[in-house]
C-alpha cells in the first residue's frame, strides 16, 4: 500500500523535513550574519516547492494506471512509463538550465548549506555545479542501461 503513495510521501517527507531542519539550523547562521530570515524562508520554500512538484507529478502519473502499485516507473506500463521518463528528463533539463545558465548554483549551494549536515565550507557553487553534472551523467547512464 505504501508504494502506491511513495512519491507523494517522499515529496512531503523530504520537502517538509528539509524545511523543518533548515529552519532549525538557520538560527545560528542568522546570528552569525550569514543569512537573513527572509533569505532562509525563500531558500527553504523554494526547496520545498522544487521537491514537491516532481514528486507530485510522478504520483499523479502513477495514479493514472489502475494497477501500478510500486514507484519504479521504469517498470510501469506505457504510457505512464513514457510520461514519467519525459517528466524526469524535463526536470533534469530544468535543473541544468537553472544551475548552469541562470546562475542557480549560488542559491542552491546556500539552500544545501541550510539543509545538509555538512560544513558550509564544503558547499559552494562550483561544487554544486560539479555535483549536478555528475548526477545528470549518472542519471542519463541509468536510463540507457535500463533500456529507456
Language model regions located:
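Membrane-interfacial, low-structure loops and terminal tails that flank and connect transmembrane helices
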Residues: 28-41, 107-122
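Short alpha-helical packing/oligomerization segments
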Residues: 2-8, 12, 70-111
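Membrane-helix interface motif
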Residues: 22-27, 56-73, 102-109, 147-148
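Long, highly hydrophobic alpha-helical transmembrane signal-anchor segments
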Residues: 38-84
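Membrane-interface interhelical loops and short amphipathic "cap" helices
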Residues: 1-3, 32-35, 65-77, 111-116, ...
